[in-house]
Amino acid sequence: MGLPWYRVHTVVLNDPGRLLSVHIMHTALVAGWAGSMALYELAVFDPSDPVLDPMWRQGMFVIPFMTRLGITNSWGGWSITGGTITNPGIWSYEGVAGAHIVFSGLCFLAAIWHWVYWDLEIFCDERTGKPSLDLPKIFGIHLFLSGVACFGFGAFHVTGLYGPGIWVSDPYGLTGKVQPVNPAWGVEGFDPFVPGGIASHHIAAGTLGILAGLFHLSVRPPQRLYKGLRMGNIETVLSSSIAAVFFAAFVVAGTMWYGSATTPIELFGPTRYQWDQGYFQQEIYRRVSAGLAENQSLSEAWSKIPEKLAFYDYIGNNPAKGGLFRAGSMDNGDGIAVGWLGHPIFRDKDGRELFVRRMPTFFETFPVVLVDGDGIVRADVPFRRAESKYSVEQVGVTVEFYGGELNGVSYSDPATVKKYARRAQLGEIFELDRATLKSDGVFRSSPRGWFTFGHASFALLFFFGHIWHGARTLFRDVFAGIDPDLDAQVEFGAFQKLGDPTTRRQVV
């Protein structure tokens, strides 16, 4: 037929059997990729340290999605929350991966069957004997079935009525686990960080989908609407389907980047806004202040800060610090976190406590500035030593660590103080192993960043696809060259351009 590459899909335009076949094959490819990717990730994933080397630091992409739906155990004998297990059951990570691969194989065979046996009676219009699809009826069937699936997920899987529940955690990502969730029917259900909204919205949307599906199955569209929206044209289906997909992609790009109950930080890593707003830093200081109010020493109060909470308060876990073209996991960037060194508290020679100004997200380098409790600059690491007034040496800055591995250790040597001041710009200070993975020291993004970039990019492309195919189906007659005001009988093949008498073909 000699079709150019960008028009090859026209071969299934008027062939319902093979149109179905290629869609089944597409499902086979997607399910096959998901299962294979899961097995690959499980092969390289190290579950030994869920606190300092969680899945998102290791660049896992499909494991977090399985985990948020209730999968936590592996046939390898480990659990995502740490520790060992003896009976993971069939629905382990490997079980889900295997199910996708088996499903992919079945879809592959079904696609071949439908390609070979394309001329089925079900696709034939009994009035004309030609292949035809009742698209409004098919729309009703799909709407009804997707409504049933949506309702079932919300009413059974999420609530734990028949299923494990979903991943639920506290606002600081410390106590996450899989548990049943009750639907939130009040106004709180509209809070994107309330897990109950996931159950209630799926139940509500599923109910609406079931009712809408039944409506479209029992009520035919008016003729004027049918013709106006080109409901008999398969390209209308393509256009509206692309619209649904790009809209969903934009929504999930937002819920991933800004955070929500569907994207827990324990599975996907913190958001950039938690660094920008000092979210974890405030909670750490609140806990320390509460400890001091209970007559604990500084050392005791800081020692009670969970290492997991301190690790979130480190700029290397900010997904906006990775460049778009820096491949690899976060561990390939700044290294594998080994331990928290503790919280450094800086003081000048007058005993004033100094705070290192933290690096904003979009800076690669930032001046080291130490301010007092009133925000007045008291010390810095100068660019030009000759003009310095506030250098660490001149001000006599010392540093002492509280909590962590260096608890109780203090330094007054200016070179060492400056080293830790530079590191304090980046949040809490951790010992990082850069040798194991040959990490290059350049920050990487987390799966949260990759997911957002991918879905936002494809949503934009699909938006243009929706406009393109929508215009093609709505203005098909215009693009074909038919004058809408043409009253004369048009004979196909009489003219080179349809309906244009100036291009009459010569009879040979």
Swiss-Prot record:
Q: Where would you find the membrane-spanning parts of this chain?
A: 21-36, 101-115, 140-156, 203-218, 237-252, 457-472
Q: Which domain of life is it from?
A: Eukaryota
Report the record's Gene Ontology biological process terms: photosynthetic electron transport in photosystem II
* Sorted UniProt keywords: Chlorophyll, Chloroplast, Chromophore, Membrane, Photosynthesis, Photosystem II, Plastid, Thylakoid, Transmembrane, Transmembrane helix
The note describing how and how many cofactors are bound reads: Binds multiple chlorophylls. PSII binds additional chlorophylls, carotenoids and specific lipids.
What's this protein's family per the entry? Answer: Belongs to the PsbB/PsbC family. PsbB subfamily.
Q: How does it assemble?
A: PSII is composed of 1 copy each of membrane proteins PsbA, PsbB, PsbC, PsbD, PsbE, PsbF, PsbH, PsbI, PsbJ, PsbK, PsbL, PsbM, PsbT, PsbX, PsbY, PsbZ, Psb30/Ycf12, at least 3 peripheral proteins of the oxygen-evolving complex and a large number of cofactors. It forms dimeric complexes.
* Name used for this protein in its record: Photosystem II CP47 reaction center protein
What organism is the protein native to? Gossypium hirsutum
Name the gene behind this protein: psbB
